[in-house]
Amino acid sequence: SAQNPDLAHSVTTEGTTAILNHAVRNGIERFVYFSTAHVYGAPLVGNFTETSPTNPVHPYATTHLEAELAVDAAHDLGEILGIRVRLSNGFGRPMTYEAADWRTLTSDLFRQAVLEKRMEMRTDGLQERNFITKTDIARAVRHLIELPQTQVGNGLFNLGGSQSQSLLAMATTIQERAQSKYSTEIPLHRPEPTTADIQHLNFDIHKLLNTGF
C-alpha cells in the first residue's frame, strides 16, 4: 500500500464501500469490517482504547480508517448493523504456503526456523506488540455475528490478545517450540539494542470482553 496508495484506496476504501452498499441494498442485517490497530498511529506505543484518537500515518491505516467511516455512517443511519474491528497482530498456520504473508514477524521467523534452522531478527526486538491467534480471531467473528444488537453499541471494538509482549519474547517462544520439535539447536540472532528501554503497548480489549467474548 505504501508503494501504491491509489490502489490501496481503490481496494480498501472504495471496495469496502461498494460491498457495504450492496449489503444495504439487499437487506443484509449485519456487516463486520476488519480494520487495523494501526489507525491509532505508528509505532504503537502507549495505551489504546476505542476512544483513543486516531492518527494513521501509512496508506494501509488511512484507507482502513476511511472504510471504517463508511461502515460507521451506515450504522448511524440505521441502514445496517455495522461492526468495526480494530485488529492487532494475528498469527497462525496459513491455509497454504502460497497464501501466507511471510513478511510478518511470526511467519518470517517460523519459516526461517523450519527451512534454515536459524532465526534472524531485523530489529533488537524490544518493541512490544499485541498478538492474537487466528483461532481466536475466528472465534471473535462468530461472537460478533451472534452478538445481541443491544450489546453492539457504536459497533467499534479492539481485538487482540490479553496482553502485549516484546518481539524478542515472541521470537524466543518460536525458537523454543522449533528446537523442541526438531530436537536441534536453532540460534536466534538480532541487532544489538541501542537502549534498554522497552516500548510498552497496552492494547485494551475490555470493551469486547465485557460483551462475553
Positions of PLM-derived features:
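Conserved cofactor-binding/catalytic machinery of classical short-chain dehydrogenase/reductase
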Residues: L7, G15-A18, R30, S52, ...
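Conserved Rossmann-fold NAD(P)-dependent oxidoreductase catalytic core, especially the SDR/UDP-sugar
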Residues: T17-P59
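Active-site Tyr-X1-5-Lys
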Residues: A42, N55-S88, A113-L115
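C-terminal substrate-binding subdomain of Rossmann-fold SDR/epimerase-dehydratase oxidoreductases
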Residues: E116-K117, M121-F213
